[in-house]
Amino acid sequence: MEVRYYLDPDTGQPHIYGHGVTEAEVEYVLRHPGEDRPGSDGSRHALGQTEAGRHLRVIYVPDEGAESLFVVTGYELRGKPLQAYRRRQRRRRR
């Protein structure tokens, strides 16, 4: 799967870097999502846990008819969104 990243116009670096997230973490969550939900304007939200144990939300747009996608952003889940994700995961396991 080819993964492309939104580049921050100010730095020229992937936008995820501004959130302290690496490409390896994003790609791991995309390959092993706990949830993959529809977003707005054709985007999708993959939520999952990295190998290091961090919980991330990755917002991406799949390319039509191709094995590739465009990552808009990714960031660590914290607070109430993290609690809600964990609650949904517990309910799924029952």
Q: Can you annotate each of these PLM segments?
A:
Residues 1-94:
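Ribonuclease/tRNase effector modules and their secretory precursors
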